[in-house]
């Protein structure tokens, strides 16, 4: 039991605190509006998650569930763990922001995410 507790403590102690990042992400994406809809992009919820992003996250459920902020965060976290695991683990807000905005291939055209990163950084 002590070993299990020590392991759980070590894991939680080493995990990055992403709360500030998600607070800013919600502010930048939707002004913290969990019911936000971008009809042009079919982006939904507080983090403006598109259908392809949702599908790539591999989270069970359906795209409309991202109106629930906790569910939306779990989608983003799964997406980040899949495409930027080191950044997720270390709390690299810049990489996570660029990935969220530019998709999993954002590194091919990093400059396309520059203005988005500036918005996030300004609000941190």
Where would I find each of the regions flagged by the language model?
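Short, solvent-exposed loop/turn and secondary-structure capping segments
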Residues: 36-38, 111-112
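Extracytoplasmic strand-loop-helix segments at the start of, or within, the mature domains
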Residues: 37-47, 51
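Sec-dependent N-terminal signal peptides
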Residues: 3-13
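Alpha-helical segment that forms one wall of the substrate-binding/catalytic cleft
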Residues: 51, 55-107, 117-124
């Amino acid at each position: 039991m002590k070993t299990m507790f020590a392991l759980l403590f070590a894991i939680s102690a080493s995990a990055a605190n992403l709360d500030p990042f998600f607070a800013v992400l919600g502010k930048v994406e939707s002004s913290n509006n969990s019911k936000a809809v971008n009809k042009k992009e079919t982006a939904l919820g507080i983090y403006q998650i598109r259908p392809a992003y949702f599908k790539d996250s591999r989270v069970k459920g359906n795209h409309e569930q991202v109106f629930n902020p906790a569910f939306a965060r779990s989608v983003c976290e799964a997406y980040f763990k899949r495409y930027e695991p080191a950044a997720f683990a270390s709390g690299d807000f810049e990489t996570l922001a660029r990935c969220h905005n530019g998709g999993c291939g954002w590194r091919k055209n990093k400059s396309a995410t520059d203005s988005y990163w500036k918005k996030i950084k300004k609000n941190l």
